[in-house]
Curated annotation (Swiss-Prot):
Expression by tissue: Expressed by the venom gland.
Main localization (coarse): secreted
Family annotation (InterPro entries): LCN-type_CS_alpha_beta_dom, Scorpion_toxin-like_sf
UniProt KW keywords: Disulfide bond, Ion channel impairing toxin, Neurotoxin, Secreted, Signal, Toxin, Voltage-gated sodium channel impairing toxin
Domain LCN-type CS-alpha/beta per the UniProt entry, residue ranges: 21-83
Free-text comment on this protein's domains from its UniProt entry: Has the structural arrangement of an alpha-helix connected to antiparallel beta-sheets by disulfide bonds (CS-alpha/beta).
An MF annotation (GO) of this entry: sodium channel regulator activity
PROSITE patterns found in the cross-reference section: LCN_CSAB
Cystine pairings recorded for this chain: C32-C82, C36-C59, C42-C64, C46-C66
Signal peptide: 1-20
Lineage, opening ranks: Eukaryota, Metazoa, Ecdysozoa, Arthropoda, Chelicerata
Protein name: Toxin To6
Record flagged with keyword Manganese: no
Length: 85
């Protein structure tokens, strides 16, 4: 039995992972991963960040959740986490 199909499958699974245009982590299973300690801003960001909505302002995945980051951490050039502007 060859291990090639197993390795190929693992590589293809890895290709599903990536980053949204705003620099936040993005995965096929949860388009609403957000680094933010503030729940209100987290929900706002979930609706407004690139790749997180269905075009109507609704999250593709309702299981939106937040991660804390160190103060001042830049997730994308010129943008701080939890900055809605």
């Amino acid at each position: 039995m060859s291990i090639f199909p197993i390795i190929l499958a693992l590589l293809l699974i890895g290709l599903d992972e990536g980053e949204a245009l705003d620099g936040y982590p993005l995965s096929k299973n949860n388009y609403c991963k957000i680094y933010c300690p503030d729940e209100k801003v987290c929900k706002w960001s979930c609706k407004h960040r690139a790749g997180a909505t269905n075009g109507k302002g609704d999250c593709i995945n309702k299981g939106c959740y937040c991660y804390d980051v160190a103060p001042g951490t830049e997730m994308y050039p010129g943008r701080l986490p939890c900055n809605p502007y």
